[in-house]
Each structure stands twice: as structure tokens, then as C-alpha cells.
UniProtKB/Swiss-Prot annotation:
Pfam families: SHMT (PF00464). Its EC number is 2.1.2.1. It is found in: Cytoplasm. It catalyses: (6R)-5,10-methylene-5,6,7,8-tetrahydrofolate + glycine + H2O = (6S)-5,6,7,8-tetrahydrofolate + L-serine. One of its GO terms (molecular function) is glycine hydroxymethyltransferase activity. This is Serine hydroxymethyltransferase. Catalyzes the reversible interconversion of serine and glycine with tetrahydrofolate (THF) serving as the one-carbon carrier. This reaction serves as the major source of one-carbon groups required for the biosynthesis of purines, thymidylate, methionine, and other important biomolecules. Also exhibits THF-independent aldolase activity toward beta-hydroxyamino acids, producing glycine and aldehydes, via a retro-aldol mechanism. Belongs to the SHMT family. It comes from Magnetococcus marinus (strain ATCC BAA-1437 / JCM 17883 / MC-1). Pathway: One-carbon metabolism; tetrahydrofolate interconversion; Amino-acid biosynthesis; glycine biosynthesis; glycine from L-serine: step 1/1. It comes from the Bacteria. Homodimer. One of its GO terms (cellular component) is cytosol.
């Protein structure tokens, strides 16, 4: 057995880890799907639980020696149920995509019709995109946003549901900044005999604390990731109140699409759920929303347009067409200035997904650092400076302005440090 520490045994990997730690410390993370986990979550994920194979479920394993991994999985399950007020939870999905696959398979066989939000309008790959399993093994029909309000077009959802009679309607998105009306989705599902699957991956942390309406009791199945606003390890989870669906979900996860669960990740999920049950986490999610509103307001003051006119959650989609610049160029310029985000298509974007006409911004990670509204207003002003420089330079950006902004980013990062003891 190799007993050397990582630095001495594999300095190349250690160097990359050190560089990534430096990046996280010295850049302001604005990618809406990312967050910063606690040392306790990292300790659980980096524990000896990684050594244990545990096919099956607690007390029903196909391997011996599962007494202690059973404890952490039961803790994760019970805490998830408490957190979201539901009867059943499966914490084994390795990702949100696998959670969605199992949820769909638990309801409808291959070839069935599903109705989900178009990727081009803010949906997720797994909601029916042609390049994804959901658009290949299912007959996927896509709804979108109202052209004027840029909110979910429920008239279109209803019309498509009546026409295609889907087995599943999917509610949820990856780039949608407004509250989702689950009751309206339920009404449409009931009218056509469809099951409602809510993918709350992006806003699960807000749901946990009442900062976003809960999908329950409207949803038949709820899927989520365990990172993003929930601030846990990267992974997935499936929730339901239906006992029969719970049994089907379990069998679709194992042995359906996965083998052994990642017990070290499940241990980290359990820790994150305990954190999310604390009063401090509610304060955190409230601040996430306040910060998003503050950031959006400053961007609008700076002449940028927010898709749908604002935000109700943790993210916003910034339309750059008025500046005649691309999301790709803007993403690169912001990163050079120490502000990390991602290019993102806007509704009906004429540019390719690799170029785009927008960027997506989110507040969860920087809020974890301690950023408040004042700090996010400062961040917003920095973003506007960089965007204006990209526009003035025909997309190239201005190295001098980026360097000036980076100094101010450094000052904010020093004011709100992370991982000081690592």
C-alpha cells in the first residue's frame, strides 16, 4: 500500500489541486450551478467510505460489511425527507441526469412522449434535448417561453399537452430566473393524464428553506442535484410521496442504471443535508436571493438587459445583444478579470451554443463566501465595466481595464476569504 502523501507521490496532481484552490480563493465564482462546500462536507467525501462497495439499499445489500455505510445512507435519506417534507428519498443517483433518467423510466417506457422545456429557452439537456438520452429514447416535445414576458408559456404547455398526450410533463430549468407555478403544471397534467416530474436541481436549496415554493404536493416525482443552491457534494437525489413510485425508482436506480452507490458521496450528502436543516442555512438562502436582486438591478442600471426583466431566485440570464458582443467573448473577458461565469443562449438565440448572445450569472458561491448586497453591487459595476470594454473593443476586451477590475476582485476575495486552513 502506498503510504506517501499526495504531494510527494504525485506532485503533478497536487500541483493542479493547489492551482484550483488558488483559483477558487482569488476568483469570484458567478456560475449559477456551482457552490463552495464546507470542510465538513469535504471531509466526509474524502473519507474511508470511498472504499466500500454497497450494491443494494440499507439492510438489503449484496455485499457484507455494510453496517456502517448503511448508517450514513439512512441518515441521508431521513434528513432529505425532513428537509423537503416528503415520504421517500433515494440518495444514490450519481448525478442529476441519472436522477432524471431513473425518474422517467419509473413512469414511462422507452418510446413514450415527454413534454419538457426547450434547451433553447432555458431548459436542461435531460428535459428532451435531441442530443441527450431524453430526446433519443423518448418522443420529446418541447415547450418554451412567452415571447413578450419571457416566462413559461402555459398556453403553449397546455396546447402541446392536449395535442400530444405526454406520459410525463417536466417542470424545471437550468437558466430560468422566475418562480415556477407547480400548481398550474399539475392542473395541465391532470387534464391529460400525465405524471409531473419536477427537476428542482437549481433551486433545491431555496425550496428547502421556503425561499421558493415547494414542488410538493403537486409533483409525482421530484429530482434534484445535491450541489448548486443545496451546497453539498456533486450528486443527485429523487423524492416522492408515492410508495409505488418509490419502489419503481429504487429498482430503476439499482439495478436499472447504476451498480454500487458512491458511499463517500452519500456520506457528504448526509452532512450537507444536516447543514441545510440549520437556521444558518435559511439565512444563507435569503441572502442568495437578495444578492441576486441587487446584482440584477446594478446590471440594468448599467444598460444591460435581464431576460424576463429580473430574477426571483439565485440566477439571471444577461442578454448582450444590445452591446453586439457574444457570450463567449464576455465569458473570457470576465474570467481574465477574475469573474467566472458561463456563456449561455438567450431565448431564440441566433448564435450557436458555443458562441451565444448571453451569459448566465448566479449568486450561491459568492454568498457562501459572505458577500452581501453591497458586495454584489460592486461586482455588478465591475461586470458592466468589463462588458463595456468588450463592446468598445469589438469583442477583444481591454487588458488594462481587466487588470484594474482584477485588483478590485482581489480586494473583495481578501475581504471574504475561503479555505484559509487548507
Amino acid at each position: 500500500m502506498n503510504t506517501a502523501d499526495l504531494k510527494s507521490f504525485d506532485p503533478e496532481v497536487q500541483s493542479a489541486i493547489d492551482e484550483e484552490l488558488g483559483r477558487q480563493r482569488h476568483q469570484i465564482e458567478l456560475i449559477a450551478s456551482e457552490n463552495i462546500v464546507s470542510p465538513a462536507v469535504m471531509a466526509a467525501q474524502g473519507s474511508v467510505m470511498t472504499n466500500k462497495y454497497a450494491e443494494g439499499y440499507p439492510a438489503k445489500r449484496y455485499y457484507g460489511g455494510c453496517e456502517f455505510v448503511d448508517k450514513v445512507e439512512v441518515l441521508a435519506i431521513e434528513r432529505a425527507k425532513q428537509l423537503f417534507g416528503c415520504a421517500y428519498a433515494n440518495v444514490q443517483p450519481h448525478s442529476g441526469s441519472q436522477a432524471n433518467m431513473a425518474a422517467f423510466m419509473a413512469i414511462a417506457p422507452a418510446g413514450s412522449t415527454i413534454l419538457g422545456m426547450s434547451l433553447a429557452h432555458g431548459g436542461h439537456l435531460t428535459h428532451g434535448a435531441k442530443v441527450n438520452f431524453s430526446g433519443q429514447i423518448y418522443n420529446a416535445v418541447q415547450y418554451g417561453l412567452n415571447g413578450e414576458s419571457e416566462r413559461i408559456d402555459f398556453d403553449q404547455v397546455q396546447a402541446l399537452a392536449m395535442e400530444h398526450k405526454p406520459a410525463i410533463i417536466v417542470a424545471g430549468a437550468s437558466a430560468y430566473s422566475r418562480i415556477i407555478d407547480f400548481a398550474k403544471f399539475r392542473e395541465i397534467c391532470d387534464a391529460v393524464g400525465a405524471k409531473l416530474v419536477v427537476d428542482m436541481a437549481h433551486f433545491a436549496g431555496l425550496v428547502a428553506t421556503g425561499e421558493h415554493p415547494s414542488p410538493f404536493p403537486h409533483a409525482d416525482i421530484v429530482t434534484t442535484t445535491t450541489h448548486k443552491t443545496l451546497r453539498g457534494p456533486r450528486g443527485g437525489m429523487i423524492l416522492t410521496n408515492d410508495e409505488e413510485l418509490a419502489k419503481k425508482i429504487n429498482s430503476k436506480i439499482f439495478p436499472g442504471i447504476q451498480g454500487g452507490p458512491l458511499m463517500h458521496v452519500i456520506a457528504a450528502k448526509a452532512v450537507a443535508f444536516k447543514e441545510a436543516l440549520s437556521p444558518e442555512f435559511k439565512i444563507y438562502t435569503q441572502q442568495v436571493r437578495k444578492n441576486a436582486v441587487a446584482l440584477a438591478e446594478v446590471l440594468v442600471e448599467g444598460g444591460l438587459r435581464i431576460v424576463s426583466g429580473g430574477t426571483d431566485n439565485h440566477l439571471m440570464l444577461v442578454d448582450l445583444t444590445s452591446r453586439d458582443i457574444t457570450g463567449k467573448d464576455t465569458e473570457h473577458a470576465l474570467e481574465r478579470a477574475g469573474l467566472t461565469c458561463n456563456k449561455n443562449a438567450i431565448p431564440n438565440d441566433p448564435r450557436s451554443p458555443f458562441i451565444t448572445s448571453g451569459v448566465r450569472l448566479g449568486t450561491p458561491a459568492a454568498t457562501t463566501r459572505g458577500f452581501d448586497e453591497e458586495a454584489f453591487r460592486a461586482v455588478g459595476r465591475l461586470i458592466v465595466r468589463v462588458v463595456d470594454a468588450v463592446a468598445a473593443s469589438g469583442g477583444a476586451g481591454d487588458p488594462a481595464i481587466e487588470a484594474e477590475v482584477h485588483k478590485e476582485v482581489d480586494a473583495l476575495c481578501q475581504k471574504f476569504p475561503i479555505y484559509a486552513d487548507i
